[in-house]
């Protein structure tokens, strides 16, 4: 009988562990299945990166997450795109270290916790709204 009791104790311990592990695996599989995939945004919508669309208005109401992609479509002969610091954003001037894009179809993948200040070198376009400020939140 003592041997039988040892076997029962072993089963009594391992079966609940196996059940807990199975439930945990199912929970994780479900979480992965429903994990948010990055979203690609065409900045400015159908009009693209153009002063006819006030970009802060376009961005208002949208929530951006790390991993999301901002795609900027524009006429590269008329416009460009620069990522600047807050001062550059407020003054519509490129700061030291600003990153310029000029292909006409540029993509920026957002990193968690970063504030993005994006504008154009053309001061008159920048001051009339061809700029935007966003922050990338933690992915969900």
Swiss-Prot record:
Annotated signal peptide: 1-28
Matches recorded under InterPro entries: Cupredoxin, Phytocyanin-like, Phytocyanin_dom, Plantacyanin
Disulfide cross-links: 92-126
Domain Phytocyanin: 39-138
Keywords (A to Z) from UniProt: Disulfide bond, Glycoprotein, Signal
Key word Signal present: yes
SUPFAM superfamilies: Cupredoxins (SSF49503)
Superkingdom of the organism of origin: Eukaryota
Sugar-modified residues: 85
Stretches of the chain forming a coiled coil according to its record: none
GO-annotated molecular function: electron transfer activity
Family matches, as Gene3D superfamilies: Cupredoxins - blue copper proteins (2.60.40.420)
Annotated function: May act as a carbohydrate transporter.
Family note: Belongs to the early nodulin-like (ENODL) family.
The protein, known as: Early nodulin-like protein 22
The species this protein was found in: Arabidopsis thaliana
Organism phylogeny: Eukaryota, Viridiplantae, Streptophyta, Embryophyta, Tracheophyta
Gene label: ENODL22
């Amino acid at each position: 009988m003592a041997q039988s009791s040892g076997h029962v104790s072993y089963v009594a311990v391992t079966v609940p562990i196996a059940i807990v592990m199975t439930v945990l695996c199912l929970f994780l599989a479900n979480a992965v299945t429903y994990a948010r995939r990055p979203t690609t945004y065409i900045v400015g919508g159908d009009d693209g990166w153009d002063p006819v669309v006030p970009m802060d208005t376009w961005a208002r109401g949208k929530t951006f997450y790390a991993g999301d992609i901002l795609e900027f479509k524009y006429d590269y002969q008329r416009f460009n795109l620069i990522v600047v610091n807050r001062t550059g954003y407020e003054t519509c001037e490129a700061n030291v270290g600003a990153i310029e894009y000029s292909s006409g179809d540029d993509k920026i993948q957002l990193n968690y916790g970063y504030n993005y200040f994006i504008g154009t070198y053309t001061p008159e376009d920048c001051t009339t709204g061809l700029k935007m400020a966003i922050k990338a939140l933690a992915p969900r």
